[in-house]
Amino acid sequence: MPVIPPVNVMIASDNTRDPFYPYGDQDMMEVWREGVRILHLDYPFADWAEAVNSAPARAMGLALGRLRPGGPADMILTQARDFPELLSRPQSDRIVLRKGEASNAKPPSYAELDGLEGLST
């Protein structure tokens, strides 16, 4: 039986590169992965993925966060064969699809980000 809480449970993080948290990179998969670990969330892990995608979208009144016919087909593909593999490694070799097309965008180099967090190195 799925573990679907009776309330809209969400996991969030200040995972941005700013003066409050200069180590972030806006990686929602990392937020979900850390949430599962830190909050000791259990099977079925797929139910808890909603806590970082469709649950926040619902709270904001957005029709996003789920794949659906005619939707934008924004998703992440990984080599993981199951949820334990997905959650035990960062999956840095993932493929990001935007509107169904593989994105070739790469994260900026750290040199490009120098000074953005408001802290000197």
Regions found by a protein language model. Name each.
Residues A46-T121:
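Active-site microenvironment of metallo-dependent hydrolases
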